[in-house]
Amino acid sequence: MGRVTSTAPAVEVVDLVKRYPKRDSNAVDGVSFAVRRGEVFGLLGPNGAGKTTTVGVLTTRVRATSGRAVVAGADVAADPPAARARLAVVPQRPNLDQSLTARQNLLFHAAYHGVGKGERVRRADDLLERFGLGERADSKVDRVSGGQAQRLMIARALMHDPQVLFLDEPSTGLDPQARLFVRERVRDLRERGTTVLLTTHDMDEAQELCDRVGIVDHGRLLDLDTPAALVARHSDGGTVEVVVTPPEGVDDVAGAVRQALERVDGVRGTDEMPAERPAARVRATVAGDPAALLAPVAEAVASTGAVVTDVRLGRPDLEDVFISLTGRELR
């Protein structure tokens, strides 16, 4: 079979269920979604939400209990080899062969997938240059940095020209320069027509890279849309964040400020944020325009005797949506 047509979804999931023995609930509980061809799609969720199991099914590593999953036109349960030939996975943790050079890692991967010798050499040279690894091509993998290893894993995954690329936390642990480079390469892949499905806990990364995102929790898909549409649908306010210095004799200035702010009309809730002592930082989530609440917020803080040293207004973002849908409880 060739590449899927432009109208067919790159990934299609229908009523997917995965139940593990001796578990009270399904790890994946009736999830359905479709990923468009050439799209960067983010699958987000807390630890244990079911996203890893869902990706495991899509990449043929986990067998579903019921439902249907298709990747690049191949049913992952009915024809796993065909699905594996059309997809590639870049794990969060490096799994490169440390005894080989960067180039050899790419060549061996392509040979495994049946790419001819001349073509795999050409692809390796091209990908090493595209991912800024040309000068490290003949270096042993155990001598490359973490950022270089991440880039090399993505390059290796592309050696058999997959139609769908699965990225697991692609920029975790990278320095800012390496993170920026990886994100630029993901955008480049989209321009070249490769479908990318990424899982990440980095909401900024998801908001910046993804055309659409699906948020899952407790095995179910809670919502799916563009980042902007999700923010508009689930957030209608913003935040007012204040940094204060305490009056003499007050040990818990953050607690006092939070209590005062929570009595202000329009304040939905407050959180204490990290700050250098003795200062305290409190963020209030508000309904409507946060600028309209500046005066009552200032009055509330003044009533505690604390002195405001900094104020910041914030608009809702994807992280606010994520917390709104999945809660604040640690997993």
List the predicted regions and their residue ranges.
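A short, flexible loop at the N-terminus of ABC-type nucleotide-binding domains that lies
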Residues: 2-12, 17-30, 37, 80
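Conserved ABC ATPase "signature" region
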Residues: 107, 111, 118-136
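ABC transporter nucleotide-binding domain
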Residues: 183-287
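Conserved ABC ATPase signature
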Residues: 140-144
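Conserved catalytic motifs of ABC-family nucleotide-binding domains
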Residues: 161
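Catalytic Walker B motif of ABC-type/P-loop ATPase nucleotide-binding domains
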Residues: 165-168
